[in-house]
Amino acid sequence: MESRNSYENKIDEISSLSESKEHPIDIQEKKDAFVNEFKGVLFDKNTRSSELLFNFYECCYKFLPRAQPQDKIDSYNSALQAFSIFCSSTLTHNNIGFDFKLFPEVKLSGEHLETVFKYKNGDDVREIAKINITLQKEEGGLYNLRGLDFKGCFFSGQNFSNYDIQYVNWGTSLFDVDTPCIFNAPAYNKSNEKSLKPVSENGLSGVLTDRNNKIKLITGVAPFDDILFMDDDFDDSSSEDDPVENSPVVTSPVVSSSKSSFQ
């Protein structure tokens, strides 16, 4: 395999170019380079996975940079959805086992929202893609996260105090308990029931939300009293009384959290 530094340099180059509409990216070339890099690791006989990776790269480096400001959030959500579809195909159709993890990590800094899509296998952590969007500021001074679909994302040490999170979809997100996030407590939020049962599953350590407005898996303690979980379009038929240890494993990418950001 190519060295980690060399591979990440490629991703940085792609990401910087993607911020400009005037620097077209050879998406096919980038897709082929990634497939060759991970041939036999993420890709085996299933060509569908590589096609879905191409679709994901298109969302990141073609459609998102060209989207109008009012369409950025929808375009961002499309990139996350395309990544989730790629991950599902990779896990389902390639005979490569489940030792690796694929996940997007979200980082906030003022008006800047950066999402780094990562591959993790033990201590080997690599970037698959990186996207950035600029958030709009509301009259009340909060940055608008409304409508963002964060399900399947990982958060570590992010401060949401200056962000409007009322209509964020947190379904199947993972929050680091070693470096917890900080949330504001606006009047519209409500407390959520939670089951504080320690869980250790495939090295998972963190707070994993389910898609039915509840916290399903918890190790440690995290500040979730002031979060409103919303995913009204998902119908979870599982019993609310099922013990946590018997809860079904989510199909979205699951990640292992470590201190700070997996580094």
Swiss-Prot record:
Acidic residues compositional bias, start-end: 233-244
Signal peptide: none
Bias-annotated ranges (Low complexity): 245-263
Stored Pfam families: DUF5508
Xref: InterPro entries: DUF5508
Protein name: Protein YpjB
Renumbered residue ranges of the record's region Disordered: 233-263
Residue stretches spanning the membrane: none
